[in-house]
């Protein structure tokens, strides 16, 4: 054992002089004040509430939601409405506000919604059309461009690179003449 052991060996570190705390300490009561009324019993010796005592409607085990009590889809806890349409932001905020179980649980959702929704609304889509593109008239159709040229022009230029040694006519030109 230590030669200078005392029960207060760790207390000296917390003295005001050691902590450099020179403020005057607050006065406190030596003993707590007495309670004037009498204590009302609300339970019997077995711990059961007596008749006439109001019972709480809350669950005695609290509002904790376990894994199996959670809904299948949980809304996001941090939601930014900055780049969303008005319809999408309304749908997300309603989803959060309608999930009351999660909002009132002790381990539940504490949503943080930030940003403003854009004023643009998407036009409603018909469910019969699905997500198909609108029909394009024949006069408006254009051939896709390949590096600034149409597909036919790019085919011609690629065939010209292979040249025959006779007369300067390429094999690609012969094929194109035969096709037209």
From Swiss-Prot:
Checking CDD domains in the record gives: Flattop
Presence of keyword DNA-binding? no
Subcellular location, record wording:
Cytoplasm, Cytoskeleton, Cilium basal body; Cell projection, Cilium; Apical cell membrane; Cytoplasm, Cytoskeleton, Cilium axoneme
Report which superkingdom the organism of origin falls in. Eukaryota
Report the GO terms under cellular component. Answer: apical plasma membrane; axonemal microtubule; ciliary basal body; cilium
Gene (name only): cfap126
Q: Does the keyword Membrane apply?
A: yes
**Originating species:** Xenopus laevis (African clawed frog)
Question: Pfam families under this entry?
Answer: CFAP126
Q: Please give the function described in this protein's UniProt entry.
A: Microtubule inner protein (MIP) part of the dynein-decorated doublet microtubules (DMTs) in cilia axoneme. Acts as a regulator of cilium basal body docking and positioning in mono- and multiciliated cells. Regulates basal body docking and cilia formation in multiciliated lung cells. Regulates kinocilium positioning and stereocilia bundle morphogenesis in the inner ear.
Which classification does the entry list for the species? Eukaryota, Metazoa, Chordata, Craniata, Vertebrata
Annotated keywords: Cell membrane, Cell projection, Cilium biogenesis/degradation, Cytoplasm, Cytoskeleton, Membrane
Main location class: cytoplasm
Instruction: Give the start-end ranges of region Disordered.
Output: 111-180
Protein's UniProt name: Protein Flattop
Where does the signal sequence lie? none
